[in-house]
Amino acid sequence: FENYIGILMGYRPEACDQCGICNIQNAVEADGSVYPCDFYVLDEYKLGNFNTDQLDTIDRKRIEIGFIERSKKLKKSCLSCPYFSICRGGCQRNRDLDMASGLYENYFCESYKMFFDACLPLMKEVAAAAQ
């Protein structure tokens, strides 16, 4: 809840899944393998290895696989949602691809709407009281 309160107060969320867009980070395994996120420690997302690759090579691979750019591809229904400013589409690991448009939507969307319908007014009160 503290990230939602912070968002309502104008702060950037600390939790990456509440940013809506992936940030540059590295998940590093014990063998030095580097991945763009701890939820994407999978062969197809491997960026390189700190034992054998330069950081600029690892960064180029991140751009090559389009990891951060993909997190920006949201359906118009998501972008126009009244809760988008606080939900931000969530983490890309929880998104389904619409093959026709090439855009994504969070598969918890309806649950988020139910949650915000019930809790957002109270969260706004807390945020206002904290300022």
Outline where the language-model segments fall.
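C-terminal accessory region of radical SAM enzymes
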Residues: 1-8, 39-82
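Short, surface-exposed, polar/charged, turn-prone segments marking secondary-structure boundaries
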Residues: 25-29, 54-57, 63-65, 108-109, ...
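Residue-level marker of regulatory loop/turn positions in helix-turn-helix DNA-binding domains and
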Residues: 20, 70, 101
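Surface-exposed beta-strand edges and their flanking turn/coil or helix-capping segments
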Residues: 12-13, 49-52, 61-62, 93-96, ...
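Detector for Asparagine
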Residues: 3, 23-26, 49-51, 94, ...
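Radical SAM enzyme core and accessory elements
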Residues: 31-34, 42-45, 73-131
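A C-terminal junction/extension of Radical SAM enzymes
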Residues: 1-43, 86
